[in-house]
């Protein structure tokens, strides 16, 4: 516990919190162009081929983003919307691509959690 004299001399230092998604620059989403679309493997206990894309954002940052859902139509030069949110088993992947927005289509035949995957409501039979 500091004395009042010590506080007058030094003062309290405010803790600066580091952003988990610095490339967003406090924006909820950012537009970007895919520079490379590829698959990568997750960390130790898991095994899969995760779909990711390297995206050049409008603010000049180049980030690796995860493409969620089953199947996608992304290619190089596709324009996508990027949001924050990391993928725990992929090191360096701190962003997600928004499904059903700009050039990326929603997941086909998705019945549940449709809003997260940009799928339209299925037609009644």
From Swiss-Prot:
Alphabetical list of Gene3D superfamilies matching this protein: Nucleic acid-binding proteins
S-S bonds: none
UniProt-listed InterPro entries: NA-bd_OB-fold (IPR012340), Ribosomal_uS12 (IPR006032), Ribosomal_uS12_bac (IPR005679)
Recorded GO MF terms: rRNA binding; structural constituent of ribosome; tRNA binding
Record-level GO BP terms: translation
GO cellular component entries: small ribosomal subunit
Region feature Disordered, mapped onto this chain: 104-125
Keywords: Methylation, Ribonucleoprotein, Ribosomal protein, RNA-binding, rRNA-binding, tRNA-binding
Biased amino acid composition, Basic residues: 113-125
Modified residues (3-methylthioaspartic acid): 89
SUPFAM superfamilies: Nucleic acid-binding proteins
Known partners and oligomeric status: Part of the 30S ribosomal subunit. Contacts proteins S8 and S17. May interact with IF1 in the 30S initiation complex.
Similarity remark: Belongs to the universal ribosomal protein uS12 family.
Function, as annotated: With S4 and S5 plays an important role in translational accuracy.
Name of the protein in its database record: Small ribosomal subunit protein uS12
